[in-house]
């Protein structure tokens, strides 16, 4: 029975239908992978603003997505307010609540929070410290809503991690002193007389970061669900529950020691006595820094260190010849100091020494050498910029592409430039062997003896030429590899657009052969329609047209109502599929029956194409 059903299905289903279904499934999977984002991706926040006499706290309840609480919203807000921090000795001025809905948080901030809707017992309640209200502050709903939105965005930036639990403690403030004029935080160690604040810890996991610019951040540690009383501290805020209390105490002791050092340095009087050389009378300058007052005058005297003594003649003769040559190169005087219309050019010698020179871009290479180098007798100065030898002295620096701050390598030797008329490089062939050039092509022999030091230059040029030849061969191989892919891609494209109608007979034989083979393969399998009057073929084409057209209409409607789901890649794929639908499926549906004259012309053109392929 099963075999009969399978056989019937195979007889009923056509290969084109199976291929179309597979393409649809592949497109659906690709679209899901590209746009794996929910169409309605948003986050719900309930924000409560608690305004106290000298403080302002914001409670943020991150509900996630599609939150359906089992309790009423009034009960939820009551539970939030019951878990608000209570401060002894202060009066709560006002409470305002705001509902925040942020759609597509990736457009607001790159949120590391997962897209989920947590249960009621796993919801994270955040307490955020806000800037305290100023004197005579009147509660403003607009400003409170702005604070609420900022708090919600801050939660998105931090991520939704329900395992965090921390506490923040408000430092004790003391009145401003005369020398600072600003409010300072008392960073002394806790004592029995220091003020203490009681905080109520509830059974809901929450964190208490601070975005108040006027208050210092604090270190957060794990606490238990017990009411705790903590003295003021001075630490840096960080969500690191692994830190222990010992580290907190050590950091507090280090801060106290730094404060003691700062107080002792403020009360000290600095006296500097500097002596200036080259003057008859020695002047002594005494600088006193009063407490909290500005420094009136500070004199800086640069002490120049004595340069190393020059080398003796015996030591110079003992050095190797190469080191001596590098020393001579670095001893060439270079004119330093900028002037009007000149740019900075850095000269780098072979011994890794650099000197700054200033020249105009309109100066020639010869003028640059004359201005910045002396003792040119029996010396050849080679300037190299970006791997290019500045050989032509009559060209300007601007023609060689020099810019302000360019680095020019300088090589000084006694080897002259190679003459253009002398063939110094043998021809390089693919087999790697050298071949002597013919005498008819060889340049006339020069009677001038070549110095012995020119051999390394020739070897260097030969190496460079071989390297360029190898690079050219690699480029040729890469081009050959890429050119082999062109007929395949072109053949696939021509198969869809009926290559039997091609009138251009000058195409390569390989391209036509492959395209014709692909076309015949697709026609034999029923993927392309032949020019016959078979009613079944027309029925299959009509069915494929209506299926494809309905899918394109559905995707277009979805794109119109949910444009946020599509990104650039998905939209590009949609455009490609739409163009294929218009130029292939729709045009095939509207294709009229050919006339007998056109059929005869097409047969003649096909015969001409086949004969041309055979001749090629």
Curated annotation (Swiss-Prot):
Basic and acidic residues composition bias: residue spans: 184-200
Gene Ontology terms: biological process: ERAD pathway
Pfam families with a match to the protein in the record: ubiquitin
Region feature Disordered, mapped onto this chain: 166-243, 272-298
Residue span, Ubiquitin-like domain: 343-417
Gene3D superfamilies named in the record: Phosphatidylinositol 3-kinase Catalytic Subunit, Chain A, domain 1 (3.10.20.90)
Ranges annotated as biased composition (Acidic residues): 272-287
Biased composition (Polar residues): 221-237
Coiled coil (residue ranges): none
Protein name: Uncharacterized protein B0303.4
Organism annotation: Caenorhabditis elegans
């Amino acid at each position: 029975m099963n075999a009969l059903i399978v056989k019937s299905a195979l007889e009923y289903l056509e290969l084109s239908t199976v291929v179309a279904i597979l393409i649809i499934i592949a497109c659906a999977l690709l679209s899901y992978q590209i746009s794996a984002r929910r169409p309605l991706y948003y986050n719900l926040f309930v924000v409560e603003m608690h305004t106290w006499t000298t403080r302002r706290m914001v409670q943020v309840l991150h509900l996630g997505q599609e939150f359906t609480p089992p309790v009423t919203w009034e009960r939820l807000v009551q539970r939030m307010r019951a878990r608000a921090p209570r401060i002894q000795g202060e009066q709560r001025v006002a409470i305002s609540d705001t509902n925040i809905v942020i759609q597509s948080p990736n457009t607001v901030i790159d949120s590391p929070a997962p897209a989920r809707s947590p249960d009621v017992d796993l919801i994270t309640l955040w307490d955020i410290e806000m800037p305290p209200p100023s004197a005579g502050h009147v509660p403003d709903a607009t400003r409170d809503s702005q604070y609420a939105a900022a708090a919600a965005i801050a939660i998105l930036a931090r991520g939704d991690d329900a395992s965090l639990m921390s506490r923040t403690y408000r430092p004790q403030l003391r009145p401003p002193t005369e020398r600072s004029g600003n409010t300072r935080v008392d960073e002394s160690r806790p004592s029995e007389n220091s003020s203490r604040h009681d905080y109520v810890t509830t059974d809901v996991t929450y964190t208490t970061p601070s975005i108040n610019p006027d208050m210092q951040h604090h270190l957060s540690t794990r606490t238990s669900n017990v009411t705790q009383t903590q003295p003021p501290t001075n630490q840096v805020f960080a969500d690191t529950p692994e830190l222990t209390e010992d580290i907190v105490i050590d950091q507090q002791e280090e801060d106290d020691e730094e404060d003691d050092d700062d107080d002792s340095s403020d009360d000290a009087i600095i006296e500097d006595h500097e002596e200036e050389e080259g003057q008859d009378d020695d002047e002594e300058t005494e600088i006193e820094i009063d407490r909290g007052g500005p420094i009136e005058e500070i004199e800086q005297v640069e002490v120049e260190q004595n340069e190393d003594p020059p080398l003796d003649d015996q030591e110079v003769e003992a050095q190797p010849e190469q080191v001596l040559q590098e020393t001579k190169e670095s001893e060439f005087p270079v004119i330093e100091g900028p002037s009007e219309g000149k740019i900075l050019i850095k000269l780098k010698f072979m011994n890794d020494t650099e000197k700054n020179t200033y020249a105009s871009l309109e100066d020639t290479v010869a003028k640059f050498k004359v201005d910045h180098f002396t003792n040119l007798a029996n010396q050849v100065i080679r300037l190299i910029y970006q791997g290019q030898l500045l050989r032509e002295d009559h060209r300007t620096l601007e023609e060689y592409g020099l810019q302000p701050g360019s680095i020019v390598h300088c090589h000084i030797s006694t080897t002259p430039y190679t003459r253009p008329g002398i063939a110094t490089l043998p021809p390089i062939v693919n087999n790697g062997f050298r071949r002597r050039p013919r005498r008819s092509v060889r340049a006339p022999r020069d009677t001038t003896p070549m110095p012995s030091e020119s051999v390394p230059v020739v070897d260097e040029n030969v190496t460079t030429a071989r390297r360029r030849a190898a690079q050219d061969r690699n480029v040729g191989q890469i081009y050959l590899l890429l050119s082999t892919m062109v007929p395949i891609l072109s053949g696939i494209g021509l198969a869809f657009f009926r290559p039997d109608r091609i009138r251009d007979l000058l195409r390569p034989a390989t391209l036509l052969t492959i395209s014709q083979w692909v076309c015949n393969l697709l026609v034999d399998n029923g993927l392309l329609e032949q020019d016959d009057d078979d009613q079944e073929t027309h029925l299959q084409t009509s069915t494929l047209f209506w299926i494809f057209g309905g899918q394109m209409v559905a995707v277009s409607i979805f794109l119109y109502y949910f444009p946020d789901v599509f990104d650039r890649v998905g939209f590009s794929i949609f455009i490609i599929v739409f163009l294929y639908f218009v130029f292939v499926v729709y045009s095939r549906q509207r294709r009229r029956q050919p006339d007998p004259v056109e059929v005869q012309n097409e047969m003649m053109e096909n015969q001409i194409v086949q004969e041309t392929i055979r001749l090629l």
